């Protein structure tokens, strides 16, 4: 029944997921890569299925073979080229760790920012994501995304760093590679025409 549940989740078949859960399917079923049903639902952005799995006892911070959690999967679906702020919000409400890290010290905020997901970044920051956390290379999220020209994300992160007490002269907000992007793009993002 676990395999059927994973298939139903990946197909975003909410009715079938509910039917299988009611029939005793394990809400923590895993696919061949170690991803749980909840991770797959989060990756697909299916809030209804996420809710059903959580109600059935899915473990919110379970990790796959690479250490990814459902929250990380909801931060960006590379195939759909989008993240899912509503799913991120729900997972956090269920107790997901917003500062969990994987290989190289990558965190959910870094994933969302790296793909230009401003709305997801805002949700994560509102729930305690550490904007000053560094990856294993010593880079903060802002330092990692400055050269990507995600103006909204850069401005969100810059404001969050400022709110965290990092001044304009800090390494993260001014002296890092690509810092000219913040200086150049910040004024543009604030105009009503952009």
Task: Place the predicted regions along the sequence by residue.
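N-terminal segments that cap or nucleate solenoid repeat domains
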Residues: 1-36, 40
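Ankyrin repeat structural motif
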Residues: 13-21, 46-54, 80-92, 117-125, ...
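Ankyrin-repeat-protein effector appendages
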Residues: 1-7, 94, 127, 139, ...
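Alpha-helical adaptor scaffolds
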Residues: 65-68, 72-85, 89, 99
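Ankyrin repeat A-helix N-terminal signature
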Residues: 7-12, 40-46, 73-84, 111-117, ...
């Amino acid at each position: 029944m676990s395999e059927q549940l994973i298939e139903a989740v990946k197909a975003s078949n909410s009715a079938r997921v509910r039917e299988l859960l009611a029939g005793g399917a394990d809400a923590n079923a895993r696919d061949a890569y170690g991803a749980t049903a909840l991770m797959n639902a989060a990756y697909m952005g299916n809030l209804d299925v996420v809710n059903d799995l959580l109600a059935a006892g899915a473990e919110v911070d379970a990790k796959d073979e690479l250490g990814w959690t459902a929250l990380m999967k909801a931060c960006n679906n590379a195939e759909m080229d989008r993240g899912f702020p509503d799913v991120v919000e729900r997972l956090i409400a269920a107790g997901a760790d917003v500062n969990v890290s994987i290989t190289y010290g990558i965190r959910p905020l870094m994933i969302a920012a790296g793909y230009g997901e401003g709305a997801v970044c805002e949700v994560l920051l509102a729930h305690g994501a550490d904007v000053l956390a560094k990856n294993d290379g010593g880079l903060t999220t802002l330092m990692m995304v400055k050269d990507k020209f995600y103006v909204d994300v850069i401005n969100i992160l810059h404001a969050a760093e400022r709110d965290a007490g990092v001044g304009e002269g800090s390494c993260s907000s001014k002296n890092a590679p690509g810092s000219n992007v913040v200086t150049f793009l910040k004024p543009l993002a604030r105009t009503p025409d952009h």
